[in-house]
């Protein structure tokens, strides 16, 4: 479907970038305007699945699209912080050591198909991401791996979550938040089983079937009937999916069963980033653009739009495949020696990033992490790279999420710098998402942000994001396994002491720079472009992006 074109007339009024508490309708009334019925929203990449907790889903733009269709006990606010969502339910601390939490879902909470939201959904989220049950292609185990058990009576609204002794996860508020809770009854209906009973009793054959459906049943494909969309993709938020368009866009409409404050705009079409963004901005057929800075080239901002550039919580990096030409740390270090990290970061307008285990925050602890060990990899040294390879030629295939002008230029810069070292770098087009292409051996390197994402990719928590390098974690795309690093990552998850965290990071840095599972480049920058008639849109450094409060958005007519 071609994007619609609207005629805009200028109106006088105050431009507001708001938060979830801002009542856009009041502002519109004050400006003598009214809200348009539809908004067009462009996000970083493809919308391939409703389940943003799989490896592919977490790396996609799904979180930007579905933060207000799949709600949870919290959402990520404009600074990346977790904000309690009391419309959904409440969390109370029963005991601090070992950590025990009670999760109470609102009595009013109901999916758009009329089925209640229950503790069964928490059990499924935990089981899928705990690492205890085989078959689930979960992106991360962070936090969930430390849960000892969940007490849930099927069909009820309350769950008690007990953590393993001495594993009181500091950032436990990151668990069971928006987009993490999938509707377990969809799987139960397909398999005709009690999902909670099967998981809590570890029924092996049933768990295998549950995992298969959790991985794939929420794939987004055009052409599904209205009834199938309604039954397979129920919503627990202010918006629900109406349809998937042929070009991959997803149409969201107001959910009439939402029990909280109703969405201001009745319809939002979420578009995957394409090469036509400038044209769409020029003809005013898009209202909000939320993408990595530079990914759409220079992107000229017309007078009828306003633009904000800001740092994300994700790190743009080279993620090396566990097989192929870069399977050995020696060859990865050789490539790193000819990558002009200084020039690449300068082109992005930011400093070089060195941190792997404290990536989400931009503070003194992060700045110090790995700084000394990274020094030899700060500038291009083709002679050292050639010597590290013993003069043997090396061919490297790099892929990335397209279209992205900045990353294409980055690969060109690397190719030019590495050629004198006898390293041939090629820009490879793949027909599968980046993480899958890396798994399948179609590329040797994925150029992406945290977790292989096209967007920020970050949870907003360094302790959670550090699990990208924990063995067995789904988005540990390099397949890295080191028991010492696993122990450090686990220790970081339960430590709030800055001195202890600094000690742990200092212990990890020499190992990680020697074994080189990834090569951090720079903190991904974001561009938020919106019509001057948009209200209540605000930036967000995490993978949920600007969509975190889309139910408050309004476009003045």
Swiss-Prot record:
Annotated SUPFAM superfamilies: Periplasmic binding protein-like II
InterPro entries: SBP_5 (IPR039424), SBP_5_dom (IPR000914)
Cellular component per GO, a single term: plasma membrane
A molecular function (GO) term: peptide transmembrane transporter activity
Location, primary (coarse class): membrane
Compartments (UniProt record): Cell membrane
Disulfide linkage: none
Biological process (GO), any one: peptide transport
Membrane topology classification: Lipid-anchor
Gene3D superfamilies the UniProt entry points to: Dipeptide-binding Protein, Domain 1, Dipeptide-binding Protein, Domain 3, Periplasmic binding protein-like II
Keywords: Cell membrane, Lipoprotein, Membrane, Palmitate, Signal
Entries under PROSITE patterns matching the protein: PROKAR_LIPOPROTEIN
Keyword presence, Acetylation: no
Lipid-carrying residues in chain (N-palmitoyl cysteine): 31
Keyword Metal-binding assigned: no
Family: To M.tuberculosis Rv2585c and M.leprae ML0489.
Protein's name according to its UniProt entry: Uncharacterized lipoprotein Mb2616c
Organism taxonomic ancestry: Bacteria, Bacillati, Actinomycetota, Actinomycetes, Mycobacteriales
């Amino acid at each position: 479907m071609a994007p619609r074109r609207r005629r805009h007339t200028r109106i006088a009024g105050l431009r507001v970038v708001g938060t979830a508490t801002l009542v856009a309708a009041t502002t519109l009334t004050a400006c003598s305007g009214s809200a348009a019925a539809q908004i067009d929203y462009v996000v970083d990449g493809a919308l391939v699945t409703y389940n943003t907790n799989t490896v592919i889903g977490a790396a996609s733009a799904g979180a930007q699209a579905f933060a207000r269709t799949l709600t949870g006990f919290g959402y990520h606010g404009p600074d990346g912080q977790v904000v309690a969502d009391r419309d959904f339910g409440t969390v109370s601390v029963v005991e601090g050591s070992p950590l025990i939490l009670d999760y109470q879902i609102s009595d009013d909470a109901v999916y758009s198909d009329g089925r209640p939201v229950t503790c069964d959904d928490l059990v499924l989220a935990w089981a899928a991401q705990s690492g205890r049950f085989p078959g689930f292609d979960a992106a991360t185990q962070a936090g969930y791996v430390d849960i000892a058990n969940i007490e849930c009576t099927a069909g009820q609204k309350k769950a008690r979550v007990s953590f393993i002794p001495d594993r009181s996860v500091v950032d436990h508020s990151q668990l069971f938040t928006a987009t993490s809770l999938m509707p377990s009854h969809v799987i139960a209906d397909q398999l005709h089983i009690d999902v909670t009973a099967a998981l809590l009793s570890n029924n092996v054959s049933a768990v295998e079937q549950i995992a298969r459906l959790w991985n794939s049943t929420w794939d987004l494909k055009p052409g599904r009937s209205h009834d199938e969309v309604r039954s397979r993709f129920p919503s627990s938020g202010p918006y629900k999916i109406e349809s998937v368009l042929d070009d991959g866009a997803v149409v969201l409409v107001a959910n009439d069963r939402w029990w909280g404050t109703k969405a201001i705009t009745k319809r939002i079409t979420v578009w995957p980033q394409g090469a036509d963004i400038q044209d769409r901005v020029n003809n005013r057929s898009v209202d909000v653009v939320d993408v990595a800075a530079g990914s759409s080239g220079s992107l000229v901002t017309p007078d009828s739009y306003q633009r904000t550039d800001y740092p994300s919580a994700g790190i743009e990096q080279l993620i090396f495949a566990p097989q192929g030409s870069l399977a050995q740390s020696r060859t990865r270090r050789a490539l790193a020696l000819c990558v002009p990290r200084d020039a690449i970061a300068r082109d992005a307008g930011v400093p070089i990033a060195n941190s792997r285990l404290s990536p989400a925050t931009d503070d003194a602890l992060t700045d110090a992490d790995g700084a000394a060990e990274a020094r030899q990899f700060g500038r291009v040294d083709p002679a050292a790279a050639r010597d590290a390879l013993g003069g043997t030629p090396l061919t490297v295939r790099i892929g990335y999420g397209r279209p992205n002008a900045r990353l294409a230029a980055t690969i060109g810069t690397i190719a030019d710098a590495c050629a004198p070292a006898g390293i041939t770098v090629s820009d490879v087009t793949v027909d599968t998402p980046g993480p899958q292409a890396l798994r399948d051996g179609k590329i040797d390197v994925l150029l992406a942000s945290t977790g292989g994402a096209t967007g920020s990719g970050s949870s907003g928590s360094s302790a959670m994001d550090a699990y990208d390098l924990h063995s067995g974690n789904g988005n540990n795309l390099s397949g890295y396994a080191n028991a010492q690093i696993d122990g450090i990552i686990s220790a970081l998850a339960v430590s709030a002491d800055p001195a202890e965290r600094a000690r742990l990071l200092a212990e990890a840095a020499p190992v990680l720079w020697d074994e080189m599972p990834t090569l951090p480049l720079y903190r991904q920058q974001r561009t938020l472009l919106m019509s001057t008639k948009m209200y209540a849109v605000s930036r967000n450094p995490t993978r949920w992006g600007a969509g975190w409060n889309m139910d408050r958005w309004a476009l003045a007519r």
